[in-house]
Amino acid sequence: MAGVQQGEKQLFEKFWRGTFKAVATPRPESIIVASITARRAVTKLETPVGPKDDEEKVKAKDLVTKTHEKNGHIKRRGRKRHSHRRARSVSFDADLSPRPVPKTKKKKKKSQRKRRRHRSPSCSPSPVRKKKKKKSSKKRKRHRSASRKGRHSGSSSRRKRKEDKKHKKRSRSHSHRRHRHRKAEIRSSSCMENRSEDCEKSGFRDGGRSSDVHGGDACRSAVKLTNKISSKCCCHFSESTVSPSRSGVEGLSKVVIVQNSESSDGKRRADYDSGNDTSSPPSSKTGITRSKVAGNGKFSCLTSPEKLRLADGDNASDSGNSLTSYDSLGKPLLRENTLHSSVFSKLKGEESGRFCVDVEKTQPLDLISDRNRSPSHDRYEDGTRSRSRSISSQSRYSGRHSRSRSLSSGRRSYSRSSSYSLASRRDSLSSVSSCRSLNHSRCTTHRFRERKRYCSSCKSRKHSRRRPSSPMRKRRRDSPSHLEARRITSARKRPIPYYRPSPSVSSRSSSILSWRLFPLTRSRTRSRSCSRSRSRSHSHTYSSYRSYSRSSSWNSLYSRRSRSRSRSYSRARR
């Protein structure tokens, strides 16, 4: 208590410099009252010495009592005493005390105090407010000058960027159309040429890679065909070596398998949404083929090293549109157990772009065809497993070799059937037909709610499903202020949702590519594949996927027919 009073006393003395030299012990009522009483005794002593100073001090005391004291009785007492004292001092020394000078001093003090009190809180925010108003007025002026569309889209630089993007996308889509038309023309012309001309051995190039090309003009035209198609269309290279029991004679042929994309490519182009996906179109991600070697039981990937990284990400081209991700379904081919470092070393070691497959050249055809039935097992990064078993029926004596393969995984089912028909043992491969049928099945929504870490493609689809349901986001989409910010940040990450009309789809595609490898052998091969995928989910416990593929090949020269049926059943437990 005493310490607090002492501190107040010191402050009071600081504020009024030289008002009093010694202060008596304060009364319990107030410090100010005690100081006034003490000051009275001091002034009585000092009145003959300096009446001018005394007058100033008295008036200052009167001010203090008026401002700081709230008790009316004390105020009255002070006023009465000070009035008596004032009269005495004025009558005693009228000539020595001019009044206007102390009044002006007091007024100055009062005005300074008022300025300190009232202007100190209000001075600091006022210039800030003015600045803010100026800023907002500038913005409004800018918006008034610009059109409403400009206001929504933002500055002119953003508009320019958008226009450039649109122009690029348009040019890209035009180039795709041109490539498609060229493909169709080249395919028809090359098929006509290849039927009439001979080709013994051929090597193919993928992309810009070169390899040795042996043979006639028909093979060169086929090479041109594959060069143009390989980068844009789903085209797969497979090398199959069939050798008889005699080691001296070897028949080597490299055959191109082209998917007839007139039916499926149109769908893919229609469903590909170029407005939102910043990655390259899905058709550029398709350099992956899986060829099963029966002798060694190995898998080898015929792909360029640039495209290997596409298989690592789960959402390679999955932009919410189900058909866009068809071509990235070669993903499970590039897993740890399938792709060895030997493939890379062979790719580097051999000539600049020639793809090699581990095929035992010394084995006869019968041994190769005997080991045709083998199950394959792939493990995914998210823990989903898929098994596919291919059963092929073939006749050993006629040398017919037909294979069918189907792979179903996760939410996608991929089935491929290829049939090889051989004229005789010593002749090499005469015709190859491959058919690929892919379908995408949509899973139910309650599975997405429960299963959070399914895969990144599921996550993107989950976002696209849930987005339109919430009214908050609808409101945000309509309002221009939110629209601008969201468009800049998240357009590249999240795709526009695309809804499939039905949960299970069956697609059919047939491809015919046949040419004459030897002058005596003329063969025509047709392959049909029908693949179905069903997706069930009973309270997110498990989901099953089935895919059936059927392929039939017919050789017109020997009038023999070989059929192959493949059935794949995959169950993924959650």
UniProtKB/Swiss-Prot annotation:
List the residue ranges forming a coiled coil, or say none: none
Q: Where is the composition biased (Low complexity)?
A: 405-422, 496-508, 540-559
* Family annotation (InterPro entries): SRRM_C, SRRM_Domain-Containing
Q: Where are the residues of the annotated region Disordered?
A: 45-217, 257-291, 366-422, 454-508, 526-574
Q: Where are the transmembrane segments?
A: none
The protein's UniProt keywords, in alphabetical order, are: Differentiation, mRNA processing, mRNA splicing, Nucleus, RNA-binding
Q: Does the keyword Manganese apply?
A: no
Ranges of Basic and acidic residues compositional bias?
Answer: 51-72, 194-217, 366-385, 478-487
Q: Where is the composition biased (Polar residues)?
A: 275-289
Location(s), subcellular:
Nucleus
A GO biological process of this protein is: regulation of alternative mRNA splicing, via spliceosome
Record function comment: Splicing factor specifically required for neural cell differentiation. Acts in conjunction with nPTB/PTBP2 by binding directly to its regulated target transcripts and promotes neural-specific exon inclusion in many genes that function in neural cell differentiation. Required to promote the inclusion of neural-specific exon 10 in nPTB/PTBP2, leading to increased expression of neural-specific nPTB/PTBP2.
Q: What is this protein called?
A: Serine/arginine repetitive matrix protein 4
